[in-house]
From Swiss-Prot:
Entry keywords, A to Z: Amidation, Antibiotic, Antimicrobial, Secreted, Signal
Domain of life: Eukaryota
Stated name of the protein: M-myrmeciitoxin-Mb1a
Biological process annotations from GO: defense response to bacterium
Propeptide segments, given as residue ranges: 27-50
Record family assignment: Belongs to the formicidae venom precursor-01 superfamily. Ant pilosulin family.
Modification type Glutamine amide: residues: 73
Transmembrane segments: none
Tissues where the protein occurs: Expressed by the venom gland.
Cellular location(s): Secreted
Pfam families recorded: Pilosulin
Length: 74
Protein backbone atom coordinates (compact mmCIF):
# COMPACT_ATOMS: atom_id res chain seq x y z
CA UNK A 1 0.00 0.00 0.00
CA UNK A 2 2.81 2.40 0.89
CA UNK A 3 4.60 1.67 -2.38
CA UNK A 4 1.51 2.47 -4.44
CA UNK A 5 1.11 5.79 -2.62
CA UNK A 6 4.74 6.62 -3.35
CA UNK A 7 4.31 5.77 -7.03
CA UNK A 8 1.13 7.85 -7.18
CA UNK A 9 2.95 10.78 -5.60
CA UNK A 10 5.82 10.54 -8.08
CA UNK A 11 3.41 10.27 -11.01
CA UNK A 12 1.56 13.40 -9.88
CA UNK A 13 4.86 15.28 -9.52
CA UNK A 14 5.83 14.34 -13.08
CA UNK A 15 2.45 15.40 -14.45
CA UNK A 16 2.57 18.74 -12.61
CA UNK A 17 6.07 19.37 -13.90
CA UNK A 18 5.02 18.72 -17.49
CA UNK A 19 1.81 20.74 -17.26
CA UNK A 20 3.46 23.77 -15.67
CA UNK A 21 6.56 23.73 -17.86
CA UNK A 22 7.29 27.11 -19.45
CA UNK A 23 6.28 27.61 -23.05
CA UNK A 24 8.93 28.62 -25.55
CA UNK A 25 7.87 30.89 -28.38
CA UNK A 26 9.74 30.83 -31.67
CA UNK A 27 9.43 33.78 -34.05
CA UNK A 28 10.72 34.12 -37.58
CA UNK A 29 11.75 37.69 -38.29
CA UNK A 30 12.10 38.57 -41.98
CA UNK A 31 11.05 41.32 -44.34
CA UNK A 32 8.30 40.38 -46.80
CA UNK A 33 10.50 41.52 -49.69
CA UNK A 34 13.75 39.96 -48.51
CA UNK A 35 16.16 37.94 -50.62
CA UNK A 36 16.78 34.22 -50.26
CA UNK A 37 18.75 34.91 -47.06
CA UNK A 38 16.48 34.87 -44.04
CA UNK A 39 16.80 35.63 -40.33
CA UNK A 40 15.19 33.61 -37.56
CA UNK A 41 15.23 34.27 -33.83
CA UNK A 42 13.91 31.99 -31.09
CA UNK A 43 12.87 33.76 -27.90
CA UNK A 44 12.12 31.86 -24.72
CA UNK A 45 11.16 33.34 -21.39
CA UNK A 46 11.32 30.95 -18.47
CA UNK A 47 11.94 31.32 -14.76
CA UNK A 48 13.13 27.95 -13.44
CA UNK A 49 12.84 29.12 -9.84
CA UNK A 50 9.12 29.78 -10.27
CA UNK A 51 8.53 26.24 -11.53
CA UNK A 52 10.55 24.71 -8.71
CA UNK A 53 8.64 26.74 -6.13
CA UNK A 54 5.28 25.82 -7.61
CA UNK A 55 6.07 22.12 -7.86
CA UNK A 56 7.60 21.98 -4.38
CA UNK A 57 4.57 23.66 -2.77
CA UNK A 58 2.18 21.30 -4.53
CA UNK A 59 4.36 18.34 -3.63
CA UNK A 60 4.41 19.28 0.06
CA UNK A 61 0.63 19.53 0.19
CA UNK A 62 0.26 16.24 -1.65
CA UNK A 63 2.75 14.39 0.55
CA UNK A 64 1.07 15.69 3.73
CA UNK A 65 -2.32 14.53 2.50
CA UNK A 66 -1.04 11.10 1.47
CA UNK A 67 0.83 10.64 4.75
CA UNK A 68 -2.24 11.53 6.81
CA UNK A 69 -4.35 8.99 4.92
CA UNK A 70 -1.68 6.29 5.22
CA UNK A 71 -1.32 6.91 8.96
CA UNK A 72 -5.10 6.73 9.45
CA UNK A 73 -5.24 3.37 7.65
CA UNK A 74 -2.16 1.89 9.31
Amino acid sequence: MKLSCLLLTLAIIVVLTIVHAPNVEAKALADPESDAVGFADAVGEADPNAIIGLVSKGTCVLVKTVCKKVLKQG
